[in-house]
Structures are given as structure tokens and as C-alpha cells.
């Protein structure tokens, strides 16, 4: 059976960027990685109503920068910035260094894979028919400029005794084209019949000229790294 690699992971260094940006020695690497995971889990749980898509963490020597991408920046900032100051204190304590928090607004949440998957999950938890929920997000995405969108829902759909998977697609989603800007996310909807898994792929167009270099340049860098390891 053919298995699908994560579309964002395979494009790292080509047209996608890392969510964690720092260098560490071998003894500190696992500590920094675990710290990043804890911070992300806390922020996603704390800001569950703020439509947070991703959290980018950058570390310097004595401080860190956390960028929160959200469709509802007002909820994150709070009244007169009170909520974001509290977040800053908690995250600084978790990471053990001073932290600066930036907020980036997502202009079109209908074209963000995580927010689309989260939207479908919320509708399923409110007992909306899954076909209606999926077709609604397909229409919204194509109307706002997506060249293609694909959605898979898996589990006991409509309370069926036997779990199954169903696919829905609008437009095209070229997973094998590295220059294709494909956003991907998965999410779980907790219903009374169990968890329903949701996967979303959104194709936004091709990136022909990017600062991270062409595919040949990326392959060349990979070859140099292999030689250096030897």
C-alpha cells in the first residue's frame, strides 16, 4: 500500500520553514525539543478559542521569540494586553529564559489546513452531519482562492457500527510536486461514538522562485552534508 508522507515535512528547506529555529549541542537538543513541545501544547490548549494555527519558536543565547499565528488576535492579546502579558510570564517560566511574544494574524482562516480541520471537528461535535460540514469548507476554500482542497474523515461516521474512511476533493492537490504550496493538518473530533479523525490538504498554488533555493540547490546542500558526515 502506498503511504503518504507529511506534505509540510517533505518541503522543509524548499518552500516551507521550520517551526523551531535554534541550534543546540547534542546534550541540550532533547531538552530544548521537549521544552518546545510543552510550550506548544500549553498554548494550543490555553488558546483553544483563539483559532491558533501554528506556534513558531526561535531561541537566541539568553532569550526566545515565540510567534503565534491566529485568526483571532484580539482574544490572544486580551483587554489592554493583559492576557498576552500573562502568557509571556508563564511561557518564560516554562522555558527558563525571557520570552518575547509576537502575534501574526491569519487573514484567510478558510485557507489554513489546521483551522479548517478544527472547524470541521467543532461542527461534528455539535452533531452536524459530516457531509454537510465537509462540503461547506470545500466551498469556502475554493471561493477564497484555493486551487484545490482534499478532506478525509475516518471513524464511526454518523454513529455507524463499523468505522470507515471517506474522501472529498475539490480541484487538484499535487502532493508529488515540491514547489506546490500544500498545507496539511490533522485533527480529532471527540463525538459520543468515539473519535473521528480529520485530515485536510489545501493546495494554494505553485511557488516558482523562493529564497530557500531551487530543488537542485537543496539537493546540492544535502550532498555536501553527507560528505561532511563521512
From Swiss-Prot:
GO cellular-component term (any): cytosolic small ribosomal subunit
SUPFAM superfamilies: Prokaryotic type KH domain (KH-domain type II), Ribosomal protein S3 C-terminal domain
PROSITE patterns (UniProt xref): KH_TYPE_2, RIBOSOMAL_S3
InterPro entries documented for this protein: KH_dom, KH_dom-like_a/b, KH_dom_type_2, KH_sf_prok-type, Ribosomal_S3_C_sf, Ribosomal_uS3_bac-typ, Ribosomal_uS3_C, Ribosomal_uS3_CS
GO molecular function, one term: mRNA binding
Presence of the UniProt keyword Signal in the record: no
Coiled-coil segments: none
Keywords: Ribonucleoprotein, Ribosomal protein, RNA-binding, rRNA-binding
GO biological process: translation
Pfam families per record: KH_2 (PF07650), Ribosomal_S3_C (PF00189)
Domain annotation KH type-2: ranges: 39-107
Gene3D superfamilies xrefs: 3.30.300.20, Ribosomal protein S3, C-terminal domain
UniProt function note: Binds the lower part of the 30S subunit head. Binds mRNA in the 70S ribosome, positioning it for translation.
Family from the record: Belongs to the universal ribosomal protein uS3 family.
Matches recorded under PANTHER family: 30S/40S RIBOSOMAL PROTEIN S3, SMALL RIBOSOMAL SUBUNIT PROTEIN US3C
Oligomer and partners: Part of the 30S ribosomal subunit. Forms a tight complex with proteins S10 and S14.
Designated name of the protein: Small ribosomal subunit protein uS3
